[in-house]
């Protein structure tokens, strides 16, 4: 009986160790985006950051409910204190279609104007586009 218990204990320990090792190498880091997606990182120095963030959150909620082109977006604050947004589009084409929609949508444009009143000139808004490989 002691021998069987010892073998079971060793077998259980071996399974546990192999599972812990497998867990150490699987699932710790998941991709932030997939191949072919476009990630946009917006940066806008903002005089009234709290108001800018509030308007940006409202804008993202509006986009989520109304954009005919699916993408994800999240508000953020850049390390230098600027207002930021990170958008992930499924493809270049999807991004282009979303931009056309934004340019034509009056409500979206009003959010942009409201952010400009909180943050300053739209000319100060910059964007970095990353194509995921």
Residue spans of the language-model regions?
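Non-heme di-metal
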Residues: 111-112
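Positively charged n-region of N-terminal signal peptides that target proteins for export
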Residues: 1-6
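Short S/T/G/P-rich N-terminal loop/turn motif that feeds into the first structured element of a domain
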Residues: 19-107, 117-133
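Bacterial N-terminal signal peptides
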Residues: 7-16
